[in-house]
Amino acid sequence: MNIHEYQAKELCREFGINVSNGALALSADEAVEVAKKLGGNVWAVKAQIHAGGRGLGGGVKIAKNLDEVKKYANQILGMTLVTKQTGPKGKLVRKIYIEQGCNIKKEFYVSLTFNRAKEQIGLIASASGGMGIEEVDKNLIKTLNIDPQIGLKAFHAYEVGDFLGFDKDLNNKFYKFLNGLYKLYIATDANLVEINPMVLTAEDEFFALDAKMGFDDAALFRHENIAAMRDLDEEESSEVEAKQYGLSYVKLDGDIGCMVNGAGLAMGTMDTITYCGGKSANFLDVGGGASAETVAKAFEIILRDKNVKSIFVNIFGGIVRCDRIAKGILEATKLTKVEIPVVVRLDGTNAKEAIELLKEANIENIYSAHDLEEGAKLAVKLVNGEK
């Protein structure tokens, strides 16, 4: 789960991380009132969406008077903001964050995330802040792995601080800043805390000028305050609905719908589709306890995507029985008008019974495949009108 910048900064404050004063606004008039209350003579007007690159997309403006605050608020609210992270469709801006300006001497990048290969917490830092870390020369990036059994220590901060060119006094301040970030990361079960930029002010203090946070969904039951920050407007409606039925669904931009059991098999299926010249329209894992009803719901969700031209169902029956999947497919054809071709590959528990069920139904646009590659090739051919 991701949260907005203003929410991430609320959490930063709780852990003693310096952030500028700011508040949320839902209208241009409210933005002006917020700026008045904050005081000062420079304010940042920031679009609040779950994506980076807002500045380049026109979603962050610096206002030097209240008239400009109102003008920029009117420009940003209601706009569809397109960035590298939103995709071409962009995201609708429903709220903005008004923040006091600060005296910036230098910008940096710093983040904490989980290094799965090392099973440690990855600290990434760069003196090139304010831009996407993927665009920075690798020689300007410092990476460090922190053993969670040991935690962040002063020597970690000093090693990174030396790389960033800090003197002793700044290293001590950087350690305090970084220690707050680390405690925030651990305490909230975050999978990402990204400060871009972290700025050094004219007063030689470190501030989080922007903050991005993501969390492990499986740990949200331990954090009711964070779960309450979820903004469903920022999430794909089909993905939200799928979760309610125990389905793991992620919408993509291809034209071959996928329905698979197990995340590993799902990723392997998508790779095979790509290898065969196709492009997946989604990731969909029906899980191990799929019933005929959940399979029918999965079909309904896939078919809602008008880009989908064929569907590939790839099931290996272990816990989930293949005959349940077959019944779900047949149920889906009764409840929803399935006009596109459906390729079905079933193997494992009750696979023979399942295949017989589909044969007996004799539905014209359901095709059977014996293995993964055959199924993927057929799904790609059917998209192109071949058989």
Swiss-Prot record:
Binding site for ATP: K46, G53, R54, G55, E99, C102, E107
Keyword annotations of the record: ATP-binding, Ligase, Magnesium, Metal-binding, Nucleotide-binding, Tricarboxylic acid cycle
Record-level GO BP terms: succinyl-CoA metabolic process; tricarboxylic acid cycle
Record's GO cellular component terms: cytosol; succinate-CoA ligase complex
Pathway recorded for this protein: Carbohydrate metabolism; tricarboxylic acid cycle; succinate from succinyl-CoA (ligase route): step 1/1
Bound cofactor: record note: Binds 1 Mg(2+) ion per subunit.
Binding site for Mg(2+): N196, D210
Record-annotated membrane-spanning stretches: none
Name of the top EC class for this enzyme: ligase
Any GO MF annotation of the entry: succinate-CoA ligase (GDP-forming) activity
Residues binding substrate, per UniProt: N261, G318, I319, V320
Segments forming a coiled coil: none
EC assignment: 6.2.1.5
UniProt keyword Magnesium present: yes
InterPro entries registered for this protein in UniProt: ATP-grasp_succ-CoA_synth-type, ATP_grasp_subdomain_1, Succ-CoA_synthase_bsu_CS, SUCC_ACL_C, Succ_CoA_ligase-like_bsu, Succinyl-CoA_synth-like
Family assignment from sequence similarity: Belongs to the succinate/malate CoA ligase beta subunit family.
Function statement: Succinyl-CoA synthetase functions in the citric acid cycle (TCA), coupling the hydrolysis of succinyl-CoA to the synthesis of either ATP or GTP and thus represents the only step of substrate-level phosphorylation in the TCA. The beta subunit provides nucleotide specificity of the enzyme and binds the substrate succinate, while the binding sites for coenzyme A and phosphate are found in the alpha subunit.
Subunit-structure text: Heterotetramer of two alpha and two beta subunits.
Name recorded for this polypeptide: Succinate--CoA ligase [ADP-forming] subunit beta
Source taxonomy: Bacteria, Pseudomonadati, Campylobacterota, Epsilonproteobacteria, Campylobacterales
